[in-house]
């Protein structure tokens, strides 16, 4: 009887040890497939409408960053800085990540991307400018446009901004708030906005003196920005996989539904 119990005990022990080894191996493989967390990483947010507000420490990109960091298992230091500074640090490799970035030929040389939403750009223009399309704004040489420094848009809007830049008809700012102020003062007559900015327009007096005009561009993909100087192509692919998992399981859609109607949230995140 004692011998029988011992044999059974040894059998169960072998099964238990085998299962533990398999679980350990699976955990090791999962860790190997995830991003490398051997050093502290850095991510910068920028203030921009519903994407992020430093005043309340809330926004779409804050929610996205929290979930991304949690899934990665890495230690990531999150800061807030101007968009122009973010691009400089991404290019130099002094910053690993930022969010809601769009690509360009120049940026593709130093940054990788993992797309998680797509949206259109619009021209917010003063009613007294009597403008109904980009062409009529451009044709009136007295009209000035305000843009956030280092921002790029869709192809048609980029060409529009570049032509006005050549004519010295651009006023730059670090963020939206200064542009709203000088638009109200008629120092500029138009500015480029996104759906993230609608709530700010609707909640202030500027709504009564402006009109939103379609730029004619299609939706532009936005995503996680990754520095090619600080992250290898292999590591970028791992972060891209994390972002894709957040899209696939509906996490990105649920984040956007906190800030937009279900219809608009789906239009921006399912593409």
Locations of regions flagged by a protein language model:
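Extracytoplasmic small-molecule ligand-binding "clamshell" domains
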Residues: 33-102, 106-109, 172, 239, ...
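Hydrophobic/proline-rich hinge and linker segments of small-molecule sensing/allosteric domains
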Residues: 41-45, 113-134, 225-227
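Periplasmic-binding protein-like
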Residues: 45-48, 119-122, 204-243, 262-271
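Ligand-binding cleft/hinge of the Venus flytrap
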Residues: 65-72, 115-116, 141, 151-173, ...
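Ligand-binding clefts/hinges and TM-proximal coupling segments of bilobed small-molecule sensing domains
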Residues: 75, 152-171, 243-271
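Short helices/loops that flank or line small-molecule/ion binding pockets
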Residues: 79, 84-96, 138, 176-197, ...
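A ligand-binding cleft/hinge motif common to bilobed small-molecule-binding domains
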Residues: 85, 100-109, 189-218
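Flexible hinge/capping segments at coil-to-helix
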Residues: 125-145, 160-161
């Amino acid at each position: 009887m004692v011998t029988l119990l011992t044999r059974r005990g040894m059998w169960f022990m072998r099964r238990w040890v085998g299962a533990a080894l398999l679980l350990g191996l699976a955990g090791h493989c999962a860790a190997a497939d995830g991003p490398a967390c051997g050093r502290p990483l850095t991510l910068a947010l920028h203030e921009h409408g519903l994407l992020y507000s430093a005043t309340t420490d809330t926004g779409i990109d804050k929610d996205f960053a929290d979930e991304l960091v949690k899934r990665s298992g890495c230690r990531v230091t999150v800061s807030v800085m101007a968009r122009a500074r973010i691009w400089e640090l991404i290019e130099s490799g002094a910053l690993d990540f930022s969010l809601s970035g769009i690509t360009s030929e120049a940026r593709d040389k130093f940054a990788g991307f993992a797309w998680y939403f797509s949206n259109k750009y619009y021209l917010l223009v003063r009613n007294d400018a009597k403008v109904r399309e980009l062409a009529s704004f451009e044709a009136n040489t007295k009209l000035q446009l305000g843009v956030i420094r280092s921002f790029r848009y869709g192809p048609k809007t980029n060409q529009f901004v570049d032509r006005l830049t050549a004519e010295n008809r651009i006023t730059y700012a670090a963020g939206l708030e200064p542009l709203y102020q000088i638009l109200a003062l008629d120092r500029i007559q138009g500015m480029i906005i996104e759906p993230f900015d609608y709530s700010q327009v609707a909640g202030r007096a500027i709504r009564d003196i402006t009109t939103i005009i379609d730029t004619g561009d299609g939706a532009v993909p936005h995503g996680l920005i990754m520095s090619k100087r600080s992250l290898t192509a292999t590591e970028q692919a791992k972060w891209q996989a994390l972002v894709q998992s957040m899209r696939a399981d509906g996490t990105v859609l649920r984040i956007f539904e906190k800030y937009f109607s279900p219809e608009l949230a789906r239009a921006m995140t399912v593409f």
